[in-house]
């Protein structure tokens, strides 16, 4: 579609970014050869990207798929899912650091950095908000709150940033912020989205954190060659700065902690 070509009728050589080793490894996971799934009902969609370029290196389209014209669970716009807590760096802490000069320690209160309090709290329109384990942990840094995926500090971080800034931040990362007349529902701070996202969108958005704040539009085909004429069309990378390198560094540092203490 991108090149306006009907691939079934035009002789082409198509050069993709597929990394055979990574794709074979992912296939073994999806097929249950190198990972034990609980049952055959559980589905999965996986995208493996080169964070520096946006090249799609491997795709896990789903499990137990046979036949043709099957939906690709990794990239389909028809089967998007709510991102849950993976939305917190995108909607909450990333914008707080980028626009409100927060640090990994705490939020900026007129030049003084303060800890968030993980305690009883409610959404602006009234309903109480809880953590996944039903407990409260008191004062904590942004680093600890994100590493432990606490909901209440995440909502408080979201509430401190102007909606227009969050919309800009998320949009620059290729995610539809689902704004309503310029405003956002507070539930998106915890990943409760109406339309949802797919793994391709999330992989590309997160890649910007490890790429100095630069977002690369993901792509799978690097070049096509018309066999009849030898004419080539090469992909032109789409790259933009989505956030400062300082914000990207701090979020990446916190996410590193998730693998250790989260």
Report each predicted region and the residues it spans.
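Mid-domain, small-residue-enriched loop/turn segments at the edges of structured enzyme/sensor domains
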Residues: 127-130, 162-204
